[in-house]
Amino acid sequence: MEKGRIVLASASPRRLELLASAGVEFDVCASDIPEEPIPGEAPADFATRLARDKAVATAARTEGRWFVGADTIVVCAGEIMGKPVDEADAVRMLRKLSGVSHEVITGYAVYDRERDGLLCKAVVTKVVFKPLRDEEISAYVATGCPMDKAGAYAIQGGAAYMVERIDGSYTNVVGLPLCEVVEDLRRIGAL
């Protein structure tokens, strides 16, 4: 019996690489939804809502059976950090993260078109940065790497040395909690 098509509602190269590394066959159809929190919305609820909206919006405009949406945010001292708007914002974010613990939250959703079913979850990983010097921050921002990353850093790239420790899923910090997503896809019959 053919399982049907899985569609990843994201153009993130990191999410594509992660899902492919688990041997999952999928198509890609990026979603384009507004990414603004609702006043008073909890960070995990925000990330999960965006993931749900991405999965459902993608299902409305493309073929497939299961639609996987995801959104990753960084939360530090109560501030939800998405992608920086410019280099100055990236510097500000990295200064705030310097030497402190923060949370990386990825909300993910799997929409099953055939059953009109929706599974939504949030995975939280705690990350601690070493204290960063302004020169380190400036040099990293100058690479351009932080500009499309929540919290202005990529744990798997040039910012790896900034991370003192993590508690939780490494792949969650990269952009997709792979263990959880693959297990849920298996559980619902997509794999």
From Swiss-Prot:
Catalytic activity of the protein: dTTP + H2O = dTMP + diphosphate + H(+); UTP + H2O = UMP + diphosphate + H(+)
One Gene Ontology term, aspect cellular component: cytoplasm
Active site (catalytic residues): 71
Residues carrying the site annotation Important for substrate specificity: 14, 72, 156
Gene3D superfamilies the UniProt entry points to: 3.90.950.10
Molecular functions (GO terms): dTTP diphosphatase activity; nucleoside triphosphate diphosphatase activity; UTP diphosphatase activity
Cofactors: a divalent metal cation
Entry keywords, A to Z: Cytoplasm, Hydrolase, Nucleotide metabolism
Residues making up the signal peptide according to the UniProt record: none
Subcellular location, record wording: Cytoplasm
Keyword Cytoplasm (UniProt): yes
InterPro entries xrefs: ITPase-like_fam (IPR029001), Maf-like (IPR003697)
Source taxon at top rank: Bacteria
Primary subcellular site in the record, as a coarse category: cytoplasm
Family annotation (SUPFAM superfamilies): ITPase-like (SSF52972)
GO biological process: nucleotide metabolic process
EC numbers: 3.6.1.9
Family, per entry: Belongs to the Maf family. YhdE subfamily.
Job of this protein: Nucleoside triphosphate pyrophosphatase that hydrolyzes dTTP and UTP. May have a dual role in cell division arrest and in preventing the incorporation of modified nucleotides into cellular nucleic acids.
Name recorded for this polypeptide: dTTP/UTP pyrophosphatase
Species name: Geobacter sulfurreducens (strain ATCC 51573 / DSM 12127 / PCA)
